[in-house]
Amino acid sequence: VDSQGQNITLMDFDQMIDGITETDELELQDTIIEKSVTFKNKTFKLPAILNSLPLGKTAQFGKLARAAFQLNENEIHTNLLHIEPGGGVPKHTHKGFELTVLLAGSFHDSHGKYVKGDFIMLDGSNVHQPTSQNGCLCYTVANDALHFTEGLNKLLNPIGSFIY
């Protein structure tokens, strides 16, 4: 029964639904704003999922650059890591875990070669020295500092938690 006391039949209901669904096609607009990041004059388009994350200033260390996402994650740190062509990270292990998604380029270490789209999970049982012949951009998530295992870089270990 409708608001005027009239009986609504099944046919009336079907006609009503048909009337609602028989509209012109709607044109959907993409509202995704593309975001990019630049390291040493090389610009990378970020995946859409990262577009809304606030990115801090870039810190440059030789052929390495890092920009931290400002996510207030306590002990978890999320970064973009750029390795320039011919660059690498000194030999190290991890005090906690490190998750890496390779966003662009490639790198290799003692475990193998990694290319765009690869997902790598490492912890304190892994020692490696990532190097990139042609450069790469990585999305990394870690819960503690690196622990350098060779050379002068070992001098950074006592202050590692302040710089990771």
Which residues fall in each region the model found?
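Short acidic-glycine-tyrosine-enriched beta hairpin
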Residues: D109-S132
